[in-house]
Amino acid sequence: MAKDIGLNVKAPKTECNDPQCPFHGSLAVRGQIFEGTVVSAKMSKSVVVSREYLKRDLKYDRYEKRRSKLHAHNPPCINAKEGDKVVIAECRPLSKTKTFVVVEVAGHESN
């Protein structure tokens, strides 16, 4: 049974024994929550998530599109694939570059 992580996301249906899973392990999530698209799932239990956001240009009073890539832990019970829209939440540093964990697959991006 998956524990409540304090976010409004659906718990995964499958079980896993990953200690770094927020639902079945002991990893606490806190901080920022982002939505993005998985652009690479080649690493073991990790994904690269690309997110687009708007940045305001004060001089011209307009917005510009920006993009950033974030590395996130991909628990086996969630198992996000390339092209999936995912919700990631901040957690403690899991490695040198990973400070986020995938908490929900919100669909698949269609081109």
From Swiss-Prot:
PROSITE patterns per UniProt: RIBOSOMAL_S17 (PS00056)
Listed GO MF terms: rRNA binding; structural constituent of ribosome
Keywords: Ribonucleoprotein, Ribosomal protein, RNA-binding, rRNA-binding
KW Cell cycle (keyword) present: no
Keyword Zinc-finger: no
A single GO BP: translation
One GO cellular component term noted in the UniProt record for this chain: cytosolic small ribosomal subunit
Family per similarity comment: Belongs to the universal ribosomal protein uS17 family.
Assembly notes: Part of the 30S ribosomal subunit.
PANTHER family linked: 40S RIBOSOMAL PROTEIN S11 FAMILY MEMBER, 40S RIBOSOMAL PROTEIN S11-RELATED
HAMAP family hit by this protein: Ribosomal_uS17_A
Biological role: One of the primary rRNA binding proteins, it binds specifically to the 5'-end of 16S ribosomal RNA.
Protein name, entry field: Small ribosomal subunit protein uS17
